A protein has these predicted regions:
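Helix-rich, typically C-terminal accessory recognition domains appended to large enzymatic cores
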Residues: 418-465, 469, 478
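Active-site cores that bind ATP or allylic diphosphates and position pyrophosphate for catalysis
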Residues: 101, 106-241, 247-253, 261, ...
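Catalytic adenosine-cofactor/nucleotide-binding cores of aminoacyl-tRNA synthetases and other
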Residues: 48, 232-388, 393-394, 449-485
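N-terminal Rossmann-like or analogous alpha/beta NTP/dinucleotide-binding catalytic cores
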Residues: 2-124, 222-234
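Long, amphipathic alpha-helical coiled-coil segments characteristic
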Residues: 391-421, 426
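Glycine- and acidic
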Residues: 7-13, 41-45, 207-212, 260, ...
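Residue-level signal for inorganic ion chemistry
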Residues: 18, 28, 59, 99, ...
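Generic alpha-helical structural context detector
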Residues: 61-64, 97, 120, 230, ...
Length: 485
């Protein structure tokens, strides 16, 4: 019987959550949940120089906001803790010593100066930088003497000199590498701390990880990982390597280069569920045409074999389209709650926000698009008379003056200032003048906003602004428009 599925998301707390990392978290979560398994959060903080204060909280908050809840982790514990790598430091050296005794690793006493000279020579010869095996077969007496004398050392993995090492990956299939191409990587550094690669393998084994999901940049390291598993006699996990997330055909998306993090996207007004939905499709293809999936639906349809081998190019337009679908599906009160902070950036006068939001929601793709649309509420914008010229509505600057002059007494007499009542009164006036509605209402929208495109038509804007402001703006515009000759 197969072991219960156990997956882990193991980020380093080095800043904001990159979208590629969040995609890895999603795929790792889906693999566990689809199989009824356990999803583990492990914090890999051994690179102390790159740690950013507060970054661990960002990891927690991001996963919670997107619904990727974990079963074991630093904050909730579990049977194989601690779940912070720096708190596990004492255990790694003994595993490396075990490999030394088995002849699968060795002490390396090379100084930094020797290694620098070696790499300079290799560079001059046009060779790839690699360790030359200088300490690989030292006599035991020499090793014992150096250890007794306190000579600094690292412990290196002893890669077989001949043969090939292969592994199977769910996405990339069977991969084989000549052992001669693999470097004797360092397992334990001179300060006694493990390297990332070594700690990763030991922790994954001790935590019972059955499926390792990570970026394809780790494909080249995987043969070394496998040799470590074999050296210990441990079961090798199932590997699922994901293609890189690219900014374009040449450049990887990278938070070091200032590319959007999850936090950046949310600050701009992308919804967490929409971002997650987009990341599902960033390098993974569902069956059929459906593209909008709830998290429960994602769990149900998940199949890692449908991950693409090709790099996934981040498509902002696709993300906007998915976000727009999520915004349209929100309950009205939820949209109002999310939109209010963005409305606050542009509007500082009293308006009917519920009506505004009812007009914004069907048109809104990203919440940060809202403020630039609303700059006319606080102050009357300068209006070019030519804005009133519209072939479809058959309007001109001169006809606009006639239309607004006809509308002014109608609106002054209006006691019910609801949108529908205002529209009905304007419609009746248009019929009485034997004009189409647009002939009257297009100039009204321009007069109230100074813009050709607004969140709602003229009667919507009038209802949002209120009667007093509507009449004031029409009066102001009438004073500036020339009459028809």
């Amino acid at each position: 019987m197969a072991n219960p599925v156990r997956t882990r998301f193991a980020p380093s707390p080095t800043g904001y959550m990159h979208v590629g990392n969040l995609r890895t978290a999603l795929y790792t979560y889906l693999q566990a949940r689809h199989k009824g398994g356990t999803f583990i959060l492990r914090i890999e903080d051994t690179d102390q120089g790159r740690l950013v204060e507060g970054a661990t909280d960002i990891i927690y908050n991001t996963l919670r906001a997107t619904g990727l809840t974990w079963d074991e982790g630093p904050d909730i514990g579990g049977p194989v803790g601690p779940y912070v790598q720096s708190q596990r430091m004492g255990m790694f050296k003994q595993y490396a010593e075990q490999l030394v005794k088995a002849g699968k690793a060795y002490y390396c006493f090379c100084t930094e100066e020797r290694l620098n000279d070696l790499h300079e020579q290799q560079k001059a010869n046009g060779e790839m930088s690699h360790y030359d095996g200088h300490c690989r077969d030292l006599p035991q007496e020499e090793i014992s003497a150096k250890l007794a004398a306190g000579v600094p050392y690292v412990i290196r993995q002893k890669i077989p000199a001949e043969g090939v090492t292969g592994f199977d990956d769910v996405v990339y299939g069977h991969i084989e590498v000549n052992n001669s191409e693999l470097d004797d990587q360092i397992l334990i550094k001179t300060d006694g701390m493990p390297t990332y690669n070594f700690a990763n393998v030991v922790d994954d084994h001790l935590m019972g990880i059955t499926h390792v999901i990570r970026g394809s940049e780790y494909l080249s390291s995987t043969p070394k990982y496998n040799l470590l598993y074999q050296a210990f006699g441990w079961e090798v996990p199932t590997y699922i390597h994901c293609p890189p997330v690219m900014k374009d055909a040449q450049h990887k998306l990278s938070k070091r280069n200032g590319d959007a993090s999850y936090q950046d996207l949310v600050a701009k007004g992308y919804l967490p569920a929409a971002v997650l939905n987009y990341l599902l499709l960033l390098g993974w293809a569902p069956e059929g045409e459906q593209e909008i999936f709830s998290l429960d639906e994602m769990i149900k349809i998940w199949d890692p074999a449908r991950i693409s081998k090709s790099p996934a190019i981040f498509d902002p337009l696709k993300l906007r389209a998915i976000n727009a679908a999520y915004i349209r599906a929100l309950p009205a009160e939820e949209f109002r709650k999310l939109a209010d902070p963005f409305i606050d950036q542009a509007v500082h006068v009293q308006i009917d926000r519920d009506l505004l939001c009812a007009n914004l929601q069907p048109r809104c793709e990203v919440l940060e698009d809202i403020p630039p649309q609303l700059d006319f509420f606080d102050a009357v914008l300068p209006i070019d008379a030519e804005m009133y010229r519209n072939k479809k509505q058959k309007t001109t600057p001169e006809s606009a003056k006639e239309a607004l002059s006809a509308l002014l007494p109608v609106l002054e007499a209006q006691t019910d200032w609801s949108r529908d009542a205002i529209f009905e009164a304007c419609k009746q006036k248009a019929e009485a003048m034997e004009k189409k509605n647009g002939w009257l209402l297009f100039p009204l929208g321009i007069a109230l906003s100074g813009k050709a495109r607004t969140p709602g038509g003229g009667t919507d804007l009038a209802a949002m602004m209120g009667k007093e402001e509507t009449l004031r703006r029409i009066d102001h515009i009438l004073a500036t428009l020339k009459p028809a000759e």
